[in-house]
Amino acid sequence: MSGLYNYNNFSPSRAASPQIRTPSSDVDSQYISQLLAEHQKLGPFMQVLPICSRLLNQEIFRITGMMPNQGFTDFDRLRHRSPSPMASPNLMSNVSGGGLGGWNGLPPERIGGPHGMAMEWQGAPASPSSYPVKRILRLDLPVDTYPNFNFVGRLLGPRGNSLKRVEATTGCRVYIRGKGSIKDPEKEEKLKGKPGYEHLNEQLHILIEADLPIDIVDIKLRQAQEIIEELVKPVDESQDYIKRQQLRELALLNSNLRENSPGPSGSVSPFNSNAMKRPKTGR
């Protein structure tokens, strides 16, 4: 992250008004300045690192609560204000280039300051290129042209690992939507028309979602698109190395499962941890 964001050696303590301090308060002031600078750098990643953000905020409030009132000079750089606009309008498009609507950027995370005030760190302004924006790319799958091709299974891969690798590589979230996105046809039929499942009336498609700094969000979306298009591209079975690779991985996973029975099942895949498991279809 440090290679992408340059804060020009910013030190919040430079704006502090001159006053007499004890050595202890000087140390505290320097520490709170460092904490606030870290909070500034973490800003674009608060959505993906919520625990780090929360712990950092807790430490800021713990330290400021221990300092005397004259030690709040660093908080003079904090002021109560409305969230600032994040970036240009977000894009949602399909592979043919037709726009399907816009997404609003997320407001910056607000933190609680002394005396219960909602405050926002106002140090050196962040570069506009560091603002996170959310964008969605839709890929329609040619199910009419290839009715017998298992697009869903191909994208998911063994234990969902193929999809997890795409997400881990690109930093994007990938969702399977539309008719056939739910494994159980009877369950899918029951869910049709219910709130949140309107997509089941549409053709099978993929949504790629990126919530990243504006200077890299389009690059990551294109990267995910290229990987997925290659992954689900129907090819002759004699040249289908992806299928052979997935079958080989599945055999290894099953072999490892048998070796570890009756205890907890393991996996040779680095993407098989419980922390990475989540449903990809449905709502």
From Swiss-Prot:
Boundaries of every KH domain copy: 140-207
Subcellular location: Nucleus
Biased composition (Polar residues): 256-275
InterPro entries linked: BBP-like (IPR045071), KH_1_KHDC4/BBP-like (IPR055256), KH_dom (IPR004087), KH_dom_type_1_sf (IPR036612), STAR_dimer (IPR032377)
Pfam family, one: KH-I_KHDC4-BBP
Chain positions found as Phosphoserine: 261, 269
Region Disordered, residue ranges: 256-283
Chain positions with N-acetylserine modification: 2
MF terms (GO), sorted A to Z: RNA binding
GO terms for cellular component: nucleus
Keyword Repeat: no
Keywords associated with the record: Acetylation, Nucleus, Phosphoprotein, RNA-binding
Domain of life: Eukaryota
Statement: the UniProt record of this protein carries the keyword Nucleus: yes
Protein's name according to its UniProt entry: KH domain-containing protein At3g08620
